[in-house]
């Protein structure tokens, strides 16, 4: 069930010029054969509707285009044609999109400014979210309030990227300019040698293990 009255689902348009998004999620960079590495971002459009933004070459954005979590950003978005999930968008100009970074919400007063947005619609049942994901809505982003956090699971994984990904990066000949104006090959971000996940108990005694975005 939902915690607080749910909003009516708004049909998001195929194009959103100068979309204003409150960033709440940034994944750890993953290798890309085309762009070197990419990050998936999620947040609340106008502070209300969930959207997913991909691809973004976050580490290679100019400093004034790099955004922290819980900051407002503005950019042109178009619906992703490669992802059936309704919240999924891509920057209109791809990796060349200009991202305007505005204010970052404070953690003061027990995160009051952030809670105002992320707690507007809260689910307490993972079963309900799974049903919505499999149903006509195809819902794939939401805030879940668990009944209990059972454990934090830390699992050791491979310390190096897959050979295929390393080879793709080398074949891509992706370069950047250093401080002296010289061209040099972009280096992949260091791989995290661990996977982190919570074991959660949600309404209905459902135990889940959602992975924590780094």
Where are these regions (language model features)?
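Nucleic-acid-binding small beta-barrel platforms of the OB/S1 family
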Residues: 1-4, 16, 101-214
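Short, Lys/Arg- and Gly-enriched loop/turn segments at beta-strand edges
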Residues: 81-91
């Amino acid at each position: 069930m939902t915690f607080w009255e749910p909003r009516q689902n708004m049909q998001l348009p195929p194009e959103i010029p100068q979309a204003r998004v409150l960033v709440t999620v940034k994944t750890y960079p993953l290798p890309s054969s085309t762009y070197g590495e990419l990050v998936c971002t999620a947040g609340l459009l106008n502070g209300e509707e969930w959207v997913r933004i991909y691809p973004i070459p976050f580490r290679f954005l100019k400093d004034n285009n790099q955004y922290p979590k819980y900051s407002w950003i503005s950019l042109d978005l178009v619906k992703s044609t490669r992802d059936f999930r309704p919240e999924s968008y891509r920057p209109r100009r791809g990796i060349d999109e200009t991202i305007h970074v505005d204010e970052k919400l404070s953690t003061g007063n027990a995160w009051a400014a952030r809670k105002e947005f992320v707690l507007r619609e809260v689910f307490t049942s993972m079963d309900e979210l799974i049903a919505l994901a499999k149903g006509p809505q195809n819902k794939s982003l939401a805030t879940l309030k668990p009944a209990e956090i059972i454990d934090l699971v830390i699992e050791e994984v491979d310390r190096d990227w897959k050979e295929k990904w390393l080879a793709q990066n080398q074949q891509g000949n992706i370069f950047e300019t250093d401080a002296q104006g010289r061209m040099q090959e972009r280096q992949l971000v260091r791989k995290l040698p661990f996977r982190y996940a919570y074991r959660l108990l949600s309404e209905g005694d459902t135990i889940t293990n959602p992975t924590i975005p780094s």
